Amino acid sequence: MTGQAAVTVDGAVARVGFLNPDQGFMDRAMEDALVAAVDRIEADPAIRAVVLTGDAPGVFIRHYDIKPLSAQAASLRERGRTFSEDRPLREAGIHTATRRIEESGRIWIAALNGTAMGGGFELALACDIRLVQAGDHRFGLPEVNLAIMPGAGGTQRLPRLVGASRALML
């Protein structure tokens, strides 16, 4: 099954529930569904607040599924493609979504009902408010321990929210 981001609306509040059994990863399908959810929410002037949460018990979004990203990187290397200011990469869905969430006039709330690492944590950081359900959950940007730069703005948002010293602890 590929990732989903299902939108429900109750009055002025929209709820976006994430589901990607069985690992709880964000993938390209969930990324596309998230952008579509942001489009739908931004098009409805009656919506004043948005709650992002996981639809699986104990899981918000564990992290971005790196298998397709690794395959894409290998394909680009095989074709001799490298980053260039003359040929920038197009904005990925997660970047579009987090940028639009930050710029939105609505209140975005990350209701963290479980683990949120990597891309899931970065999505939560883009929200105005983060609420955490009690439990043994993990949060952070573990990719930095593998010398991989977080790719969805976490390195900028986290220090702004908690300060540089605390950000380094995560």
Model regions and ranges:
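Crotonase-fold acyl-CoA enzyme core
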Residues: 99-170
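A generic "binding-loop/recognition-motif" signal
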Residues: 22, 56, 135-137
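Conserved CoA-thioester-binding segment of acyl-CoA-metabolizing enzymes
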Residues: 1-53, 75
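Hydrophobic/aromatic residues within transmembrane alpha-helices
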Residues: 16, 52, 65, 123-124
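Alpha-helical elements of Rossmann-like donor-binding domains used by nucleotide-donor carbohydrate transfer enzymes
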Residues: 33-36, 96, 169
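Glycine- (often His-adjacent) and acidic-residue-rich active-site loop
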Residues: 54-96, 147
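Charged catalytic carboxylate motif
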Residues: 29-33, 93, 100
